[in-house]
Amino acid sequence: MSADALLPLLKSTFGFDHFRGRQSEVVDRVMAGERTLAVMPTGAGKSLTYQLPAVALNGCVVVVSPLIALMHDQLRGARAAGIRAASLTSVDADWAETRQAYRDGQLDLLYVAPERATGEGFRSLLEAQTPALFAIDEAHCVSEWGHDFRPDYRLLRPLLDAFPEVPRLALTATADKHTREDILVQLGIPGDGLILAGFDRPNIRYAVRPRISPAKQLVDFIAANPGPGIVYAPTRNGTERLAEQIAAATGRSVAAYHAGLDPERRARVQHDFVASEDGIVTATVAFGMGIDKPDVRFVAHAGLPKSIESYYQETGRAGRDGDPAEAMMLWGADDFARARMRLSELPEARVAGERVRLNALAALVETVECRRALLLRHFGENPPERCGNCDNCLEPGRQVDATVLAQKLLSAVYRTGQSFGAGHIEAVLCGRSDERIASRGHDKLSVFGIVAGEEARLIKPLVRSLMAREALDTTEHGGLMLGPAARAMMKGETAVLMAEPPVKRTQREGGRTSRADRAAANPVGDPLFDALRAMRRELAAEAGVPPYVIFHDAVLRTMASQRPATRSALADIPGVGGKKLEAWGDAFLNVIRQF
């Protein structure tokens, strides 16, 4: 059965008239019994490529997923669409009931964690009733090349090979060329089984800023972005501190999330965020991977992510519903200093690969070109030179040649003994003497007072730039020291080009999303839209599910604009499937009739 033959089922189950992107190709291969690796951007509808076959195929689709919270979120969504779904996790109390339902053929979907899937007991269960499909979600976890390697994923192959006739579908949003090749090998998928749907998330606006006053920068960014959001901080203390500062400045609901909280508290923060329409979580990177929340409107990083892959995945948690979303990163020279210190602690075999990842991040934060283009080229794509939806495209900066200034700065670091901070070096270069400088004789050095005028404004940004380029590093006490790339710069063998810092950055930290775009995404002030959202909240509370499980905002916007008066008219709206129409259609029609 082809994907096209499943279009009526797609409409009746999920409320969609057609497939998106390359969904139909993936479904075609699944229905033909092929083995497939689908690399699709977050928000492109990866889960539909196994949920629709789960309804169409005879037998149960077994989904391997790494996070319990993610499984349970997807479970709620599947059940709301009328799919018979269950999970076997450490927090599920109904194991016996679920296993019996599987044996009796009463399940369409069974979610399981990799550590459960690789146990002998689970294989015995599958031998009693052969599954219709293995779907391996977050498949990059199987690869040591990937940014989130999990050893349990490596143990899946024997289970898959025990059922060679069962098709395999591996899914990921984040895999560079090396990782993709490794996934194919590790999961026994042929090279022609790769479907690469691309990595672009055109609805996300990317911005990168030097970290100057992080709390204020984040507050300004959040003030311009209504709706739910995630702020990533490098440390547990940072999440707590930012939560307090953002809540005090904005009056919004903000909760911290990190591994130091007890499990009950973490579960509560996650539950409240998923159910909210405007909540904010400040978190370490542990948060978000287990979240299936499509209406996150922004993601901010208060520090440097671990890698380009991590950045792509974390920012990809915004705008999964297709509406406009924002991603902003704040970075500082100390981020690179800490990252390089961590490099020195790694096994030798991993250092080269991690250095490549760090240098890719340096290129992202340093570039004056299109950030989206750089990001997509990292994943092997050939994007246009300009995207029109990142800070560098919207607010182009001038590139300046800072080669000579870099030589002066590096010379000052060297001549002062490679142990003083950026403020001290700046004072020496600009000829500002004080007791500390005079007592060390630094006012007598040849580099004292050799920088003036416009050059002086570039010193601090240049320190950040040289840290990112490995020309500067820091001592254990925070002083500046020369890095491995310094020698070539000091000899004039390497040119140093950098973005000229703006005289005054607009208060809007995330770019310039048009008011029209934002109003279209979230038309607050439309009485009917507000009433439909209120009804959604009420129904979600009754059903014990997050509001987006009822209907996405896009569906409510279409209801508000089209004002359907009958069930059949409501069923024509994309996203209104048969089960949801039956369960909640009349409630929304009653709201519409009041306007």
Regions found by a protein language model. Name each.
Residues 2-13, 17-21, 25-47, 55-57, ...:
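Helicase motor core with emphasis on the C-terminal RecA-like subdomain
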Residues 350-381:
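Short, charged low-complexity linear segments at domain edges
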Residues 1-9, 353-354, 382-595:
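Accessory DNA-binding and partner-docking regions appended to nucleic-acid-acting proteins
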Residues 30, 222, 273, 365, ...:
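Short helix-to-turn junction characteristic of helix-turn-helix DNA-binding domains
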Residues 28, 185, 313, 328-332, ...:
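Generic alpha-helical structural context detector
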